[in-house]
A protein has these predicted regions:
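Flexible, surface-exposed loop/linker segments and immediately adjacent secondary-structure boundaries
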Residues: 114, 120-162
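Bacterial N-terminal signal peptides
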Residues: 11-20
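An acidic-aromatic
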Residues: 74-132, 203-204
């Protein structure tokens, strides 16, 4: 799977985590602090109709001890009775690329190559690091509870100074990654996420300038590219 597509899917996993997680998942065994955090997340999710944000993504290669940094914007519409879930990511650095996911279909447009990669998200699940992030996408609340152990790590300030609660999600069954971590703000929004793969490579996603419940035209989730673009099945 294309490297940018993998990184885009990590962001997608974070966004879809918002619609998959519920306070009820862990209330039975939660501490008072966890109950508060999960309750805030649950209320945020129920009130969320859309969001847009700036995205910074850092991929760290543990073998080379080197980072690759990506910057762009994300738009998100949760699943409704009338429409499937929709996510769009527009990368501006280091290269201009656009990714859109609507329901179980994704498209990745690479202008510099005049190429469009198309496929289904479920077929992407088996592709390396993408699998772990995409797991968030299709999990029901019951599946999330069954597959992850949630641990409260503590309070931390993330880049920009935002105060957050730091949670660690450890898969109960083998996956392509070891752990996922999220940093939840006072509104109940995961502002940062980190996935650590089995080889200790990490991908960290930071959301900034978040605008919630904005008016989004569904047409933005359909990529606009030249008719002569080369189509590649992902």
């Amino acid at each position: 799977m294309n490297r940018i597509l993998r990184t885009g899917i990590i962001t997608l996993g974070l966004a879809l985590f918002l619609s998959a997680f519920s306070a009820s998942n862990a209330m039975a065994q939660a501490s008072p602090v966890m109950r508060d955090i999960l309750g805030r997340m649950d209320r945020y999710n129920k009130a969320l109709t859309s969001f847009q944000s700036n995205v910074t993504m850092v991929k760290w290669d543990s073998l080379l001890n080197a980072n690759d940094t990506y910057e762009g914007t994300a738009s998100y519409l949760p699943k409704s009775s009338k429409n499937p879930m929709a996510v769009r990511i527009d990368w501006s650095k280091p290269a201009v690329e656009q990714m859109a996911v609507r329901g179980d279909q994704y498209e990745l447009y690479r202008p510099r190559l005049n190429q469009v990669i198309k496929g289904k998200t479920n077929s992407a699940k088996s592709n390396g690091a993408a699998g772990g992030a995409l797991a968030f996408m299709s999990m029901s609340k019951a599946q999330l509870q069954a597959n992850y152990t949630v641990r409260y790590i503590g309070q931390e300030a993330i880049s920009g100074g935002t105060q957050t609660w730091h949670l660690e999600l450890t898969p109960k069954t083998p996956t392509s990654y070891k752990t996922a971590e999220i940093w939840v703000d006072s509104d109940g929004l995961p502002r940062q996420a980190k996935v650590t793969e089995k080889n200790n490579d990490t991908t960290t996603v930071l959301l900034q300038n978040v605008r919630t419940n904005v008016t989004l035209n569904a047409s933005i989730f359909k990529l606009d590219y030249p008719k002569n673009a080369k189509i590649v099945n992902g």
